[in-house]
Amino acid sequence: MANNSMLEQQTAAAANPLDAHEYATRTAIRAIAIIASVYGMAASWQGLMTFTYFTNLSNLMICVALAGSLVLDTTSFMRARSLATNSAESAASSSSKESLEVWFDSKSNAWYVFKFMMTIAIAVTFTLYLCFLAPTNKLGFVGAYMSNGCSSLCVHAIAPLLAIVDFILFDYRFRSTSAHIYFATIPPLAYVAYAAMLSEFAGVRWGVHAMRAPYNFLNYGAPAGWFGFAPQTFNATTLGVGVAYLLVVFTLIFIGVGRVFLALKDARARAVLQN
């Protein structure tokens, strides 16, 4: 019953007209996020190795999601303005003048599912860097973000936070179910398999320590391996805990984050209906 009620609220929210101010706000947030993401990736470009890091892959995909939403919303907005302008009564009636500012979000729910998955992926980037990579960076916590012309800050904080804000504020029309939360764990887990295959079958190594994984929490080549414990080895190359255990913990955290995002999105949908 609760799920049906929420779906009805989300469907009703989808029918609500939007104004030019919301279009401008959406556009600004998405444009800034995309610029920050592209700058951050370009400033830290490493050739093909760039595409072996989850940070860059998640930033690429969130750029696709944000740019796609920007194009789709712009199309809907411009179509609404064009129809209103071409209306026979638009030049004379005040209601027509008001309609110039009204448009509807026409994105499909499948697109929202994709965007939600990419939002969780970029949230993974934000969370893991904040909690594990920045604190163990040789430059220190602040230095980790400010290095290389603040490119790290752009891809690990600015772009992720703006993408999360964009989802919560503007994707309340997304008709979500709990299954979508589990879909959103697919990209991070698929990346783990991708990185392991690069290491095992292509002999790729990462960083000055030639790690067998791009990140210390995935470095199964460290003494802790997949299922061990070696807390005394905690440093920039390992957390001293078996990678398998960390993956279980991370997955549970990401499921929790997904639930929080959907709860905030649903609260936003209810607020829109009340207004």
What are these regions (language model features)?
Residues 98-121, 177-186:
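Interfacial segments of alpha-helical transmembrane regions
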Residues 25-40, 119:
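Alpha-helical transmembrane segments
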Residues 2-22, 76-110, 265-275:
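Membrane-interfacial, low-structure loops and terminal tails that flank and connect transmembrane helices
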Residues 42-48, 131-143, 200:
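Juxtamembrane "helix-exit" motif on the non-cytosolic side of transmembrane helices
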Residues 202, 207-262:
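Membrane-interface transmembrane-helix boundary segments in multi-pass integral membrane proteins
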Residues 158-176:
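Alpha-helical transmembrane segments in multipass membrane proteins, preferentially the mid-helix core
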Residues 149-161:
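Membrane-interface loop-to-helix entry segments
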Residues 121-122, 182-203:
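Hydrophobic alpha-helical membrane-insertion segments
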